[in-house]
Curated annotation (Swiss-Prot):
Function summary: Catalyzes the NADPH-dependent reduction of L-glutamate 5-phosphate into L-glutamate 5-semialdehyde and phosphate. The product spontaneously undergoes cyclization to form 1-pyrroline-5-carboxylate.
EC number(s) stated in the UniProt entry for this protein: 1.2.1.41
Catalytic reactions of this protein: L-glutamate 5-semialdehyde + phosphate + NADP(+) = L-glutamyl 5-phosphate + NADPH + H(+)
Gene source species: Thermotoga maritima (strain ATCC 43589 / DSM 3109 / JCM 10099 / NBRC 100826 / MSB8)
Gene, per the UniProt record: proA
Protein's name according to its UniProt entry: Gamma-glutamyl phosphate reductase
Length: 415
């Protein structure tokens, strides 16, 4: 608790400096971070190797080990994310709108940083960099609490970040990392209203629901991704196959990977044998409803427990549906509101799907894997929000700000 309180106080104090930093100063800090990540690459990869070995010794499944693992390419991606964020427009100080009253009083709505942000996340060390650079660019200090799986990796990365900040005008304490992995600290952290303006949990359902249900600090809920793809009867089946394979297998341990496949009954006999074979070639365990198993008998029977489950693994459940209406009803029942996709050549069905599906991202003829800050042009992201209030979808720079009213008068008084 002593470490937590001490570091929470530090990020609150540092925010008074950071929120008034210039764009040039913030960009310089992010550039230095990129340089230090490159300089400390070997040290970071060695720390990560230790984390990965420990995870495998504990029997962690490979899809989750993949989320933990770093390599030169992923370090390069972190550096590229820094460069991208440097190139993004600084949202702080933007005049959202303004107007002048009849009496000459001028009112403007101006974008400002939210304040010190607490990030609670699990096994992805790249989150440490992505959240830090977005927080800094948007004028927010950050208190990081990573999972025990990635402790060595995160310590090495944060050490590089803080070393970089020492060479800039940005306070080193703008980024603090909680090294104590005691889970009881999570409860303490999410109740530090005196020091934190926002808490963002990034992880599985258990972590997110715990933070949401117990926090007194406002929470930006990043969501579980039980994502669906519906193959309509009019879909180009040849083009549909690579979309489904991409959505399921590119990185199955991410929240924007497809977990469920819905197939129109009129194309099921033609399409299911093809897509099941292709999925299996990519190492996917295929589960299916009764109608699916009538067509492809050797798929694993799907149970009711499958439909709401986010696998985060090379597993997919298939359901045959009568039409777009049944597909929509199924998605409404089991969706987590993350990313949902329809593959179709029918404009009316596409329009209906987009209109009736309530999710952060709704796709027509595209993989759900695009729900990502970088892919959407936001640079890095701090998470994918599935809530409706304040921010939804990839949370980038603009979503890490709020606003205040600036009112300019000539000694006006209210009549």
């Amino acid at each position: 608790m002593d470490e937590l309180l001490e570091k929470a106080k530090k990020v609150r104090e540092a925010w008074d400096v950071l929120r008034n930093a210039t764009t040039r100063e913030k960009n310089k800090a992010i550039k230095k971070i990129a340089e230090k990540l490159d300089e400390r690459r070997k040290e970071i990869l060695e720390a990560n190797r230790i984390d990965v070995e420990k995870a495998r010794e504990r029997g962690v499944k490979e899809s989750l080990v993949d989320r933990l693992a770093l390599n030169d390419k992923r370090i390069d991606e972190m550096i590229k994310a820094c460069e991208t964020v440097i190139g993004l427009k600084d949202p702080v100080g933007e005049v959202i709108d303004s107007w002048v009253r009849e009496d000459g009083l001028r009112i403007a709505r101006v974008r400002v940083p939210i304040g010190p942000i607490g990030i609670i996340y699990e096994s992805r060390p790249n989150v440490t960099v992505e959240t830090t650079i977005l927080a800094l660019k948007s004028g927010n200090t950050i208190l990081l609490r990573g999972g025990s799986d990635a402790l060595n990796s995160n310590k090495a990365i944060v050490s590089a970040i803080r070393e970089a900040l020492k060479e800039t005008e940005i306070p080193e304490s703008s980024v603090e990392f909680i090294e104590n992995t005691d889970r009881s600290l999570v409860l303490e952290m999410i109740r530090l209203r005196e020091y934190l303006s926002l808490v963002i949990p990034r992880g599985g359902y258990g972590l997110i629901s715990f933070v949401r249900d117990n926090a007194t600090v406002p929470v930006l809920e990043t969501g579980v991704g039980n994502c669906h793809i519906f193959v309509d009867e009019s879909a180009d089946l040849k083009k549909a196959v690579p979309v489904i394979i991409n959505a399921k297998t590119q990185r199955p341990g991410t929240c924007n990977a497809a977990e469920k496949l819905l197939v129109h009954e009129k194309i099921a006999k033609e399409f299911l044998p093809v897509i099941v074979e292709e999925l299996r070639k990519h190492g996917v365990e295929v589960r299916g409803c009764e109608k699916t198993r009538e067509i492809v008998p050797d798929v694993v029977p799907a149970t009711e427990d499958d439909w709401p489950t986010e696998y985060l693994d090379l597993i997919i459940a298939i359901k045959v549906v009568k039409n777009v209406d049944e597909a929509i009803e199924h998605i409404k029942k089991y969706s987590t509101g993350h990313s949902e996709s329809i593959l179709t050549e029918n404009y009316s069905n596409a329009k209906k799907f987009v209109s009736e599906i309530d999710a952060a991202a709704v796709y027509v003829n595209a993989s759900t894997r695009f729900t990502d800050g970088g892919q959407f042009g936001f640079g890095a992201e701090i998470g994918i929000s599935t809530q409706r209030f304040h921010a939804r979808g990839p949370v980038g720079l603009r979503e890490l700000t709020t606003y205040k009213f600036v009112v300019l008068g000539e000694y006006h008084v209210r009549e």
